Amino acid sequence: MKTNPIHKEIKANLARSGMTLTEVVSKMNMNRAADNQTTIQNISNKIIRGTIKYSEILEIASILNMNIVWKDTRKEEIQNV
């Protein structure tokens, strides 16, 4: 099975932060209502399949003390011409 870019990026950022996905999911559940809890298996499957919600990615980034940056690539195209 081909690894999707989201999977690679989340794995790399977990490694950079020194946290495991288990620790991240535990922190996710601390901030969620009891009826909205998730599991390591659920999040892992979503990451692998590429079906994870953007809101969950933002939640993971926040736990890792990271920001997601949207960069205007049109400016790069103009500068590289």
Label each region the model flagged.
Residues M1-E23, K27:
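A short, Lys/Arg-rich alpha-helix, primarily the initiator
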Residues A12, Q37, S62, V69-V81:
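Short, charged recognition helix plus adjacent turn
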Residues K53-V69:
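DNA major-groove recognition helix of helix-turn-helix/homeodomain DNA-binding modules
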Residues K27, R32, E77-V81:
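Short secondary-structure boundary/hinge segments and terminal tails
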